Structures are given as structure tokens and as C-alpha cells.
Amino acid sequence: MARKVILDVDPGIDDAMAMCIALFDPGLEVVAVTAVGGNCDPEQATRNVQTVIEQLDPPRWPRLGAASPPDEGLPVDGRHLHGDDGLGETNFPVAERQHVHPSEKVICDQIRDASEATVTIVALGPLTNIARAMVYDPELHSVVGQIVMMGGTVSGPGNISPAAEFNIYCDPAAAKAVFRSLSTKTLVPLDVTNQILLSYDLFNQLPDETTRVGRFLRRVLPPAFRGYRQQFGVEGIHVHDTITLMAVTHPELFTTEEMAGEVETSGELTTGMTVFDRRRVPSWRCNMDVVVDMDAKAVTEAIISGIHRAAARER
């Protein structure tokens, strides 16, 4: 039976790539895609979720959730890598939708509508929606199956500040609330996702433009390559969110350790930093599994094969 998942995304080019794979994966039933502000503002993120789904036209359309601003506003965005529209300045046309419920309501409704503890939340952006859902439904932790989160670092540097990773930095208070929740959680940090760089050679292995998936990715990815070259001087792009999806679909390719993690919310230089008690005799209680390594070659192959499978399953 297919695994029920909710994709919580801030598209974002790598979010869009993850959606391409997940929406056509026969092992997944994507019951909802919920938007959150991060790489772009909440309104644009909501539009982009709808854009990706319209462009791909998967066999089963999931419920959509609309993003709203975090309580303290977004401190940063990802326009330097993803463009003003979050999808590489592609400006796809999109139909106007009415009555899209807030993301946190959609999350709670889908989890409550399913059999107990069978839905996995794949959180690929800031954790704003997940924290709000836990306020909206205080017992959510007991009925969600698992939360798999892309974010944070264990021992490496951040990517938006010297100490903080982008998703956690965008809404550290929300991340702190989710880290402290009683839910079953797995964190996929930068230490691991930075191991893979999607190169031009891999780009050339994508499906061609006769498929919707190939046409979409070949339009949105080139601006990301330019952004990474201009910002970082590298010939390739990181696909943090797609790797996180692989941790759900191919867990055998990843190594995890149980850890005790917290989020710094008030440091002058360290706001958004993820802190783990890794002392020989820790005093914090373990609260999540953290991915510490992966078979990078096999994960890369799984990403490419997942995209080709998506193109082959277009109706």
C-alpha cells in the first residue's frame, strides 16, 4: 500500500524537483501539498505550489494549502538562487483558485481523515506550518506517523549565516516548537545534503522536453545553475529538498543516529542555529533521529531514476 505523505514546501526550485518525483511515485500517495513562505513570500509560495501541480498534471491531484506569513515575518528569502518568483523567473501562467484553506488546517484535516499514525509530513521549508498545526490540533503529535524535516546542521556551518541553515533561520521559534514536540521526527541536515551537487552532466540525463516533467525541469533548473555560479562559483546546484524526499522513499541509503536537538532563538550571532547535545554523557533527552551519512552515489541515481519514472508515468 502506498505511503500517505503531506509535502510542506516553499517552492523553490529544489522543492519543485522533489514534487516532480513524489507526485508520480507509486510508493507514495501525496494527499496534500501545503505552501509555506521561505524561498519566496507566502503568496508566491502558494502560487508556485499550484503552478507546479498544473504544469505536471499528476494522475491524482492533492489538496492544496495556502501559506500565511510567520508571526515575526520572513527575515530572508531565496531570490538570489531561485529568482523573484521562486521558479527561476519562469512566470508560468496559473489559474485563479478560490477558497484554498490555510496550510495548517489542511495538514490537520488530512492527518485526522487518515487511519491513525499513517501520514508522514515531509517538511522541506521553514517549520511555520507544522508548528501552527500543532497549536491548531494539540494532539497532532500522537496521530501523525512521522515528520521528516530538511534543515539545520550538526557540526558544519550554516548557509544563511555562519551558524544557521536557511529553513530553521526563517522561523526559529517554529522550529524550536517542532523540535520540542512529542512527535516522531527525522532531521536531514546540511552536513548530509551538501554531499551531492547536481552537475550539468546529471542535468543532461533528465527526460527530454517531450514530457511534462522534462519540459518543466529543463525550464526551471538553468536559472538555478546560473545563481549557484554567480553566488558560490560552483558548476552545479544543491538539491537539499530532493535528498530529503529520498530519505523517505529510500531509507536504506541513509544512516541515522538518535540525538537531542534544540534551536537557538535569541542569540545575537547564532539565531536559528541547531544545537545538539553530543557530550560523552549528555543531559538532554534524545528527541529525534538525525541523518548523519548517506550513499551519495546511490541517492543521486535514485533521484535521476525517480525523475525518469515520473516522466514515464505521465497520463
Explain the meaning of each model-derived region.
Residues 3, 46-114, 286-299, 304, ...:
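Metal-dependent C-N hydrolase catalytic cores
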Residues 82-84, 129, 240:
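Histidine-centered active-site/metal-ligand motif
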